[in-house]
């Protein structure tokens, strides 16, 4: 790594310069993209920290392998075994700090139209100081007095914010599927194979949704019990069928010719994921069998211990959670997505069918693309106008912080933090 590149990265961490890829084999990166990537990286770090805090395994390993662990915990007043740094209440506090971080930047970046203002420089740079600020806010949340009142109030705020974020995800998925269907339909004028591609993808979407509902019916229900799970599966499955019929109804087709089964298929897959998340978060039911023994029902039985589905649920759920959140946060704030959500789409004749339709067919050259051979290579693409809405970007991450808090803690009351912890 050259000295010029090191100086550029130092300017990125401690100044207003944009982050770049230093390797010569790496392409230039746009400032608008690198900024969003850095905020997403901070977000992922906090999500991973929350998952660690919900892990009893990590707490036991730390106690076994860290010398003077109990003395250290008492020294920082975190309890005899640092119990204040793990569990539901710890996740609530860390997510409170992250939510405050993004909400402050939401207010700070209101009405920014280009990257020349001093507020835009703060948004696009000073990453080291922002990391310190994020860490300070997450740590400071542990010193909030009157824990019970704070956690009770914050739980309701988190529930409202989580539901709002789910709504944003649904709207974004509709826009995504509409763009997908519209782009591939445009290619049918020159190549009829695009019809086959649309049909294949639609079939895959409905197969995933149907297969998911069937598997959940097999593993999360039993013949004479689990009535709540059966009702949830029946209602959500019925709603997926309803939106599929509405999507191809004559009234919708007249108002929106590009509507079809692809959109409803994508939404059905997402509803299936939400149903899986709800069922996996629901506490297991324990009943007495005919021999008077406690039997756990309404959870997958893979033949090991009480919560034998936890590893599968946690890995799959966390992966889907991070993927959905990052896609929503990074794409819902672009101006093209905002226009599409308001019903303003590109003219059909301007559409060029592409497999990777999410990306523009070619980069937009700017005067900043200088053919330098080494050092930071950033394309400052927002001097004339921002690519995305800064304040809305931070607001979506604010809601995502609340959604993560509720999802990682299984939407439970913090008082029940000892009931069930992720492995």
Curated annotation (Swiss-Prot):
Glycosites: 113, 183
Gene Ontology terms: biological process: antiviral innate immune response; L-serine biosynthetic process; myelination; phosphatidylserine metabolic process; phospholipid biosynthetic process; plasma membrane phospholipid scrambling
TM segment ranges: 37-57, 90-110, 125-145, 157-177, 199-219, 231-251, 259-279, 312-332, 386-406
InterPro entries reported in the protein's UniProt record: TDE1/TMS (IPR005016)
Extracellular side: 1-36, 111-124, 178-198, 252-258, 333-385
Tissue spec: Highly expressed in placenta, skeletal muscle, spleen, thymus, testis and peripheral leukocyte and is expressed weakly in the heart, liver and fetal brain.
Keyword Cell membrane: yes
Catalytic reaction list: a 1,2-diacyl-sn-glycero-3-phospho-L-serine(in) = a 1,2-diacyl-sn-glycero-3-phospho-L-serine(out); a 1,2-diacyl-sn-glycero-3-phosphocholine(in) = a 1,2-diacyl-sn-glycero-3-phosphocholine(out); a 1,2-diacyl-sn-glycero-3-phosphoethanolamine(in) = a 1,2-diacyl-sn-glycero-3-phosphoethanolamine(out)
Top-rank lineage group of the source organism: Eukaryota
Recorded consequence of changing residue 328 to I: No effect on scrambalase activity. Impaired antiviral activity
Location in or out of the cell: Cell membrane; Cytoplasm, Perinuclear region
Cytoplasmic topological domain residue ranges: 58-89, 146-156, 220-230, 280-311, 407-423
CC terms in the record's Gene Ontology section: centrosome; cytosol; extracellular exosome; Golgi apparatus; intracellular membrane-bounded organelle; membrane; myelin sheath; perinuclear region of cytoplasm
Any single Pfam family the record assigns to this protein: Serinc
Keywords attached to this entry: Antiviral defense, Cell membrane, Cytoplasm, Glycoprotein, Host-virus interaction, Immunity, Innate immunity, Lipid biosynthesis, Lipid metabolism, Membrane, Phospholipid biosynthesis, Phospholipid metabolism, Transmembrane, Transmembrane helix
Membrane topology type: Multi-pass membrane protein
Record GO terms (molecular function): L-serine transmembrane transporter activity; phospholipid scramblase activity
Family membership: Belongs to the TDE1 family.
PANTHER family: SERINE INCORPORATOR, SERINE INCORPORATOR 5
Chain's role: Restriction factor required to restrict infectivity of lentiviruses, such as HIV-1: acts by inhibiting an early step of viral infection. Impairs the penetration of the viral particle into the cytoplasm. Non-ATP-dependent, non-specific lipid transporter for phosphatidylserine, phosphatidylcholine, and phosphatidylethanolamine. Functions as a scramblase that flips lipids in both directions across the membrane. Phospholipid scrambling results in HIV-1 surface exposure of phosphatidylserine and loss of membrane asymmetry, which leads to changes in HIV-1 Env conformation and loss of infectivity.
Record-given protein name: Serine incorporator 5
Lineage: Eukaryota, Metazoa, Chordata, Craniata, Vertebrata
């Amino acid at each position: 790594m050259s000295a010029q590149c090191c100086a550029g990265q130092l300017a990125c961490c401690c100044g207003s310069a944009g982050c770049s890829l230093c390797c010569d084999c790496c392409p230039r990166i746009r400032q608008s993209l690198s900024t969003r990537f850095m905020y997403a990286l901070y977000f992922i770090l906090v999500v991973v920290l929350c998952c660690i805090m919900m892990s009893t395994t990590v707490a036991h390993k730390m106690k076994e392998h860290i010398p003077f662990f109990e003395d250290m915990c008492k020294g920082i007043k975190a309890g005899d075994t640092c119990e204040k740094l793990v569990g539901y209440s710890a996740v609530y506090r860390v997510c409170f700090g992250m939510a405050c971080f993004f909400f402050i930047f939401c207010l700070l970046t209101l009405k920014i139209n280009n990257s020349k203002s001093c507020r835009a420089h703060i948004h696009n740079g000073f990453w080291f100081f922002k990391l310190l600020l994020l860490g300070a806010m997450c740590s400071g949340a542990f010193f909030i007095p009157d824990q019970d009142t704070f956690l009770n109030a914050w739980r309701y705020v988190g529930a409202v914010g989580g539901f709002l974020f789910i709504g944003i995800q649904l709207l974004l998925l509709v826009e995504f599927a509409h763009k997908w269907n519209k782009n591939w339909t445009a290619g049918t004028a020159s190549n009829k194979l695009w019809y086959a591609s649309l049909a294949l993808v639609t079939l895959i979407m409905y197969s995933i949704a149907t297969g998911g509902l069937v598997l959940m019916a097999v593993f999360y229900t039993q013949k004479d019990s689990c009535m709540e799970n059966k009702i949830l599966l029946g209602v959500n499955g019925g709603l997926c069928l309803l939106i599929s019929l509405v999507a191809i109804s004559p009234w919708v087709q007249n108002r929106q010719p590009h509507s079809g089964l692809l959109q409803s298929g994508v939404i059905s897959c997402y509803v299936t994921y939400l149903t899986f998340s709800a069922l996996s978060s629901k506490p297991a039911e324990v009943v007495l069998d005919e021999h008077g023994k406690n039997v756990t029902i309404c959870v997958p039985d893979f033949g090991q211990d009480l919560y034998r589905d936890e590893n599968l649920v946690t890995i799959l759920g966390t992966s889907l959670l991070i993927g959905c959140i990052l896609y929503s946060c990074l794409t819902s704030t672009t101006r093209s997505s905002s226009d599409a959500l308001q019903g303003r789409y590109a003219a059909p004749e301007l559409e060029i069918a592409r497999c990777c339709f999410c990306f523009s067919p070619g980069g937009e050259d700017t005067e900043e693309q200088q053919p330098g051979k080494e050092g930071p290579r950033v394309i400052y693409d927002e001097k004339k106008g921002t690519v995305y809405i800064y304040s809305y970007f931070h607001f979506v991450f604010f809601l995502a912080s609340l959604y993560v808090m509720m999802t990682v803690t299984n939407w439970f009351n913090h008082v029940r933090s000892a009931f069930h912890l992720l492995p």
